[in-house]
């Protein structure tokens, strides 16, 4: 997300293997899958995650996708879960997707049984949320980003709906170590000692995998879901220039490691070959006609305080560990950065953590044996968190009623985290603020005394909940949702819960479910960043410390208690088959959106040259060694915003197929080894360059290859036209 939501990726992992034709059986469940490209604009658009004005998209490392999974009881209820390669879900995106689904399917898919959950990548285009706070660095609303998401989610659900197949479901759990650490341990230690003593670690280590077995294909046709409770990486930092974060879509340390593990699990560690039709801009995997289709996804859970930088946080100027309580170096936060397992190579860190996930998921999949049985059901409500009355346990026994507050950001949020520090003189753990920044704040909105008291001890830096011009700066009304598949219960939350906050929520819901079902045990997991976005949810005790997560807990110290109260209501309604009060509707602010992003005016090349021309080729008769060398080629290009190449590719590696005397596609935008980078000499230049880098994998087959670039140009006197260009041939050995 943005610097106010800088956490990394924990994982919810879903893996579906299905055949596309429908058959009938006596299975308890029908299951469908879909996957569609949501990459969006690969140039000029600020990325959603760091609130860094310099992090502007300029290429593609991995294409982003929406992955839809539908589970239904035959002729009864169904749920649809969509995993989104995006920083978070957007309330506006959810509203528009549901509108489209209702137009197509009536009341079959609604906000009650559809969950849209972000992976929390910090390397995807921004500008698709509807509240001003999340649109500042993207220069307002970006229609291309928004439309790519809405279109892709809709198409993925359509695919899943049209490919329902019968099957059974298994579940398995296991411990995964050395993949995440708590980045705010001083805040975690403020939780009660007796509570902390119940857990061995200060982050959750359990991976839950759900394996779906297709009735016709048996164990070969499988579907897996995995909630991995930790965060998976958040940044790509240049070692020599640590303030520069990646501008390549889905670059490390975000969805890359998820895609890395997903791809490894999809292929058993072998190369995946894809075919691509430029004319139709459609990509599909090579597969035998009688084999099931495969889709995998990693999603977020309660990882608000979890980091993949498992080596710890260090000062880049001295090499010493950062100060413990405020994560500073010499009193400043800018020099304090976490280190991943492959330090200083962030791509290597991506590979290492992805491989660790893959190995654990593969082991759990192989050994899964417990069958999921029971009904499919769901409950959903909208809650106004700006003024929610919450009943909590009183200090002297009994109970008392407290209230949440309108949204506000504390000084500590501007300090960032060890995964992406902030700027100026902000520090984590600041419960006082300073006069200068209070003066700056008051120019925007001076919080009322009631708001100051309600948010205490948070010193308010941005009073977003009370800022309404030109329209709302932050959400007030949020969705809460429970999805049930037998004994598996998914808590869909519109934000990032810290480790202990998530534990409390899960335990509270488990207690309600167990007491209301004669002691039956349920597997309860959290799907974070779902359906909307409201930043962080820390415990009451963590809130007092005001590190990044507490300072970014919008609705005051009782935010978590509010969530627990509302989810207990949903759980009771679920068990008792009671109808849930839908609550107040969130606003649809599409008509109020403002965009300051300039359109593409024209693309040009120097006189005597053409789009697609190679400007830096491979050496003549060159040879490259697989597993060691990098092939780099440059082309005259045009702005990637002219055509998003949805379900297509900007970059392609082709291999000469002896015997057939033709070039065949091998690697494209979706492959870890291939990178498409776009640049221009200065911001308003009409000339641009595409650089394609192929890090030849060890698994590449020896042979003759070439690199091809596809693009679209907009000239001053004509409409957009497509072009392509290819490098000279070279040998890989």
UniProtKB/Swiss-Prot annotation:
Q: Where in the cell is it found?
A: Secreted; Endoplasmic reticulum; Golgi apparatus
Q: Which keywords fit this entry according to its UniProt record?
A: Endoplasmic reticulum, Glycoprotein, Golgi apparatus, Hydrolase, Lipid metabolism, Secreted, Signal, Sphingolipid metabolism
Question: Signal peptide span per the entry?
Answer: 1-25
According to the record, glycans are attached at 325
GO terms of molecular function: N-acylsphingosine amidohydrolase activity
The knockout outcome noted for this protein's gene is:
Increased sensitivity to C2-ceramide induced cell death.
**Which function does this protein serve?**
Hydrolyzes the sphingolipid ceramide into sphingosine and free fatty acid. Promotes oxidative stress resistance.
Q: What is this protein called?
A: Neutral ceramidase 3
């Amino acid at each position: 997300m943005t610097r106010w939501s800088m956490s990394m990726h924990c994982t919810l992992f879903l893996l579906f293997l299905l055949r596309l034709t429908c058959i009938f059986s006596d299975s308890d469940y029908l299951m469908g899958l879909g996957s569609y490209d949501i990459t969006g604009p690969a140039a000029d658009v600020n990325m959603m995650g760091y609130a860094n004005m310099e992090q502007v998209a300029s290429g593609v490392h991995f294409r982003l996708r929406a992955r839809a999974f539908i589970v239904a009881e035959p002729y009864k209820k169904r749920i649809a879960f969509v995993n989104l390669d995006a920083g978070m879900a957007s309330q506006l995106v959810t509203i528009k997707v549901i509108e489209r689904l209702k137009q197509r399917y009536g009341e079959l898919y609604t906000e009650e049984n559809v969950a849209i959950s972000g992976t929390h990548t910090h390397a995807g285009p921004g500008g698709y949320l509807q509240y001003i706070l999340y649109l500042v660095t993207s220069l307002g609303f970006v229609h291309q980003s928004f439309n790519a998401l809405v279109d892709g989610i809709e198409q993925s659900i359509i695919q899943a709906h049209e490919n329902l197949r019968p099957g059974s479901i298994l579940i398995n759990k296991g411990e995964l170590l050395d993949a995440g650490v708590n980045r705010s341990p001083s805040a975690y230690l403020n939780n009660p000692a007796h509570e902390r003593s119940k857990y061995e670690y200060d982050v959750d280590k359990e991976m839950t995998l759900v394996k779906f077995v297709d009735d016709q294909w048996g164990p070969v046709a499988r579907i897996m879901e995995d909630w991995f409770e930790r965060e998976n990486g958040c940044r790509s930092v240049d070692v020599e220039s640590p303030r520069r974060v990646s501008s390549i879509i889905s670059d490390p340390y975000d969805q890359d490691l998820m895609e890395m593990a997903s791809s490894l699990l999809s292929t058993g560690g072998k190369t995946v070959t894809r075919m691509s039709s430029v004319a139709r801009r459609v990509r599909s995997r090579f597969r035998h006609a009688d084999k099931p289709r495969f889709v995998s996804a990693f999603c977020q859970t309660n990882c608000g305080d979890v980091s993949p930088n498992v080596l710890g946080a260090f000062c880049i100027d001295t090499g010493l560990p950062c100060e413990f309580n405020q994560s500073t170096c010499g009193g400043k936060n800018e020099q304090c950065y976490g280190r991943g397992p492959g330090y200083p190579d962030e791509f290597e860190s991506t590979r290492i953590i992805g491989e660790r996930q893959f190995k654990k998921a593969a082991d759990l999949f192989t050994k899964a044996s417990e069958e999921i049985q029971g009904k499919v059901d769901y409950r959903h409500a909208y809650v106004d968190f700006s003024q929610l009355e919450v009943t909590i346990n009183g200090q002297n026994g009994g109970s008392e009623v407290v209230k949440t507050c309108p949204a506000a950001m504390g000084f500590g949020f501007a300090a960032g985290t060890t995964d992406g520090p902030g700027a100026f003189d902000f520090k984590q753990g600041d419960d006082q603020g300073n006069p200068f920044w209070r003066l700056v704040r008051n120019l925007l909105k001076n919080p009322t005394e009631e708001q100051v008291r309600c948010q205490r001890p948070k010193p308010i830096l941005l009073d977003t909940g009370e800022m309404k011009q030109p329209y709302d700066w932050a959400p007030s009304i949020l969705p809460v949702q429970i999805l049930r598949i037998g004994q598996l219960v998914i808590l869909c939350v519109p934000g990032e819960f810290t480790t202990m906050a998530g534990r409390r929520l899960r335990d509270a819901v488990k207690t309600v479910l167990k007491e209301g079902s004669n002691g039956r045990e349920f597997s309860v997991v959290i799907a974070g960043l779902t359906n909307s976005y409201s930043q962080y949810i820390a415990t009451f005790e963590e809130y007092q410390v005001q590190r990044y997560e507490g300072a970014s807990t919008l609705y005051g110290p009782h935010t978590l208690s509010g969530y627990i109260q509302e989810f207990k209501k949903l759980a009771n309604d679920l068990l008792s088959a009671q109808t849930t009060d839908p609550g107040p509707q969130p606003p649809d602010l599409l008509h109020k959106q403002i965009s300051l992003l300039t359109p593409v005016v024209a693309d040009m090349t120097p006189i005597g040259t053409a789009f697609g021309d190679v400007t830096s080729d491979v050496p003549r008769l060159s040879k490259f060694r697989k597993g060691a060398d990098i092939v780099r080629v440059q082309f005259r290009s045009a702005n990637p915003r002219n055509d998003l190449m949805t379900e297509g590719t900007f970059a392609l590696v082709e291999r000469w197929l002896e015997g057939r005397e033709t070039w065949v596609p091998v690697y494209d935008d979706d492959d870890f080894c291939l990178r498409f980078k776009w640049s221009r000499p200065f911001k308003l230049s009409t000339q641009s360059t595409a650089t394609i880098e192929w890090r030849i994998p060890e698994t590449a087959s020896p042979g003759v290859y070439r690199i091809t670039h596809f693009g679209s140009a907009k000239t001053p006197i004509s409409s957009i036209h497509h072009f392509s260009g290819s490098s000279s041939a070279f040998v890989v050995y």
